[in-house]
Amino acid sequence: MLFSTVFFSSPSYAEWKKVVEGASGDTYYVDSERIQKHGGFIYFWYIRDYLNPETNGDLSGKEYRQGDCKLFRYKILSSSFNKEPMGGGISFPHPFFLIEDWKSPGNSIDGIILKSVCSHQLSRIYK
């Protein structure tokens, strides 16, 4: 039941705030309403909205991540792809994309996202 809720919840109830646009033109958003801190970690949803459809027709991807702000690293807890922009339409979960180990993003787009979520300054994200 939880699985269905996670992957089929509507993005219309989220507060998606733009964080950064990549060199490819893809845009990255974080749901500012669902950022949570628990047990020394931060948990958040993010969407990558593709400028152009992927070869399989996906227009966006959505992930739920666990962040470690002290060590500047993250884990992917769930991952899905969508046939509509902004995580809309039917979600197709991709468990093989899950990373069991922590990943250090450095100065990549993932690093910009994690830094924004961890800093809580998020002038571009928070109201």
List each language-model region with its residue ranges:
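N-terminal secretory-pathway/extracellular module detecting exported/lumenal segments
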Residues: 10-64, 68-127
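Bacterial N-terminal signal peptides
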Residues: 1-6
